[in-house]
Regions:
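Mature-region segments of soluble proteins
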Residues: 125-128, 145-258
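N-terminal secretory signal peptides
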Residues: 1-8, 19-23, 27
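N-terminal Sec-pathway targeting helices
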Residues: 11-12
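Short, well-ordered coil loops that connect the C-terminus of an alpha-helix to the N-terminus
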Residues: 19, 109, 156-157
Length: 258
């Protein structure tokens, strides 16, 4: 399959749907998208899309997987291409030998996993397509630790509803990149914290040492440079309160299912 497939950005699709098929597809920078009433329409469309997606797809349904011959020769490194902090640079310099992933929040037994331990755990390999909201896509091969194993090891609370991923890259003063998913996606068999890409160690530009792969959602949900995983029952307490950097800063959909 070619990696040149173009997908319609979901915000434009939802805008068109919310306007009753009038054919009016507005760019994200259009002044109308700043109107509170219009934003409410978009949020309603997002909720409808999420509900339809859950109804149509079984909670365990897999995203399409591909063959080795489908792997894209070029996989664009989008967004940050470095963690951007002195602490992260030090981890890169010593090849993450002293780095560890923290699992905490609403868990019974908070855990720390170093990279060697993560690589020694049961892993999953998958060749999947990364679909960017900008309209490009690429196919890559990923191997990593299933997120559900880490949450189970930490004893996830029955009161937890969301999993938040705290990342090393900074997108402004006091604004590190972060993302979140619900428990359906957190426990999905294809949701992994990837430490390998295309049979090699995950490159820095693609999010080393760990990158979230949540294969049934758009690219901005695939958080890079994951440093900490936190279980919570409420997303409103984090930064702008919408569950992710792009959601907070640019009103992207929190649920980006495809």
């Amino acid at each position: 399959m070619s990696d040149s497939n173009i997908i319609l950005p979901r915000r434009r699709f939802l805008t068109g749907a919310a306007l009753g098929g009038s054919g009016l597809l507005l760019a994200g920078c259009d002044a109308l998208t700043e109107d509170p009433g219009f934003r409410s329409i978009l949020r309603t469309g997002e909720a409808l899309n999420k509900g339809a997606h859950r109804l149509i797809m079984d909670r365990g349904a897999l995203a399409p997987e591909f063959s080795e011959s489908d792997i894209s020769p070029v996989f664009k490194a989008n967004g940050s291409i470095s963690g951007g902090t002195p602490e992260y640079a030090a981890h890169v310099a010593d090849k993450f030998a002293r780095w560890s992933l923290r699992i905490d929040g609403m868990v019974k037994n908070p855990q720390n996993f170093d990279l060697k331990t993560l690589m020694g755990m049961p892993s999953r390999e998958q060749i999947t397509r990364h679909d960017c909201v900008e309209g490009w896509s690429a196919i890559g091969k990923w191997r990593g630790t299933p997120l559900r194993l880490l949450l189970q090891a930490a004893g996830l609370s029955t009161r937890a509803r969301f999993i938040v991923f705290h990342c090393a890259d900074q997108w402004g003063p006091g604004m590190p990149y972060y993302e979140s998913v619900d428990l359906i996606d957190a426990f999905h068999p294809q949701t992994i914290l990837a430490w390998s890409m295309n049979d090699g160690i995950l490159p820095v530009k693609h999010g080393a040492p760990l990158r979230l792969r949540v294969e049934r959602q758009l690219g901005y949900k695939q958080a890079k440079y994951v440093m900490r995983v936190e279980a919570t029952d409420d997303l409103s307490k984090f930064y702008g309160g919408k569950g992710g950097y792009w959601e907070d800063a640019h009103d992207y959909d929190w649920y980006a299912g495809i």
